[in-house]
Amino acid sequence: MALETLKIYEERDVVGHVRNVMGHFGERLQKLAEHPLVGNARACGLMGALELMKDKATKTPFEASDKVGPAAEGRCLENGLIVRAIGDNLAFCPPLITTDAEIDEIFDIAEKSLDETEKWVGEQGLRDT
């Protein structure tokens, strides 16, 4: 089974495809670093993560009990995007065959979900303002 999988990867040039789309993935992920909730954005190939911060200027994290990461994950899911919250980090890992258009859709939904989470953070009084 593993050898057949490797054969398919080679026939379909999956690694070459990842090389072609990973730049766009990284650019779209880095654009979200400008969002008020995001303190850090990082990517390697088609894996990426956003670290959510209470205060991005001072890199102050939210309290674990605030559950901002799970709240953002829930909003992503409600909007049709599956991500994984690991604490207050949102992990993105699309299929290796994803297209530039699908990457745009992923990050458009992520941005909308972050906006909704930012509103929720304000409503919950989780920021000192």
Regions found by a protein language model. Give the residues of each.
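Conserved N-terminal phosphate-binding loop of PLP-dependent enzymes in the Aspartate aminotransferase
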Residues: 1-129
